[in-house]
A protein has these predicted regions:
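OB-fold and OB-like beta-barrel modules that bind single-stranded nucleic acids
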Residues: 1-3, 72, 128, 166-167
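Terminal RNA-binding accessory module
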Residues: 87-167
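Short C-terminal domain-edge/linker segments immediately following a structured domain
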Residues: 30-36, 71-75, 103-106, 156-162
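Conserved non-cysteine loop/helix-boundary elements of the Radical SAM core domain that shape
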Residues: 1-71, 77-96
Length: 167
């Protein structure tokens, strides 16, 4: 499930003209986890939106820790001509935005590794997608229902098939 977050701070969300709060967002994630078995939840975050402060950025990091996304798509804010955000004052220096961006990536990478480790030993259905020529042993790339990449040994005749594999 991909639920667009944009920011983990209500003040930033308001400046973005988003019509939801972080509490409403968290509730949506809770409902997914209540009604689906091990749902993969992904999101996107914009770093350095005009007016974002260090404290607001820290709120986004805190929300990442709280929700524990499976993966994250993140971008440094860049103005688009014709949008309201392009006309906003943007006091955040690019160097600061880059630091925030890296902290966000580092935090999510750690969370993703922790979440991946939870799957070790489990048997999951996968779709065998393509050959993996870079690995002579685990020569097939597969995807779980939660879009996790899994490398397994096998014959190319398995391409396009669904199989169960032990992680």
């Amino acid at each position: 499930f991909h639920l667009s977050l944009q920011s983990g701070c209500d003040a930033t969300l308001k400046r973005m003209n988003r019509k939801y709060t972080t509490k409403e967002y968290e509730r949506g994630c809770e409902l997914l986890r209540k009604y689906f078995v091990h749902p993969a939840i992904t999101t996107d975050v914009i770093v350095g939106f005009p007016g974002e402060t260090q404290e607001e950025f820290e709120e986004t990091l805190s929300l990442l820790e709280e929700v524990r996304f499976d993966s994250l798509f993140t971008f440094i804010f860049s103005p688009r001509v014709g949008t309201p955000a392009a006309k906003m004052d943007d006091p955040v220096p690019m160097e600061e935005k880059k630091k925030w961006f890296q902290r966000l990536l580092d935090t999510q990478n750690r969370i993703s590794v922790e979440k991946h480790k939870e799957y070790i030993g489990r048997i999951l259905p996968v779709l065998v997608e393509e050959e993996n020529p870079a690995d002579a042993v685990n020569n097939l790339n597969c995807r779980t229902d939660g879009w996790r990449l899994v490398h397994v040994p096998g014959d190319v005749s398995l391409l396009g098939q669904r199989k169960k594999v032990k992680i």
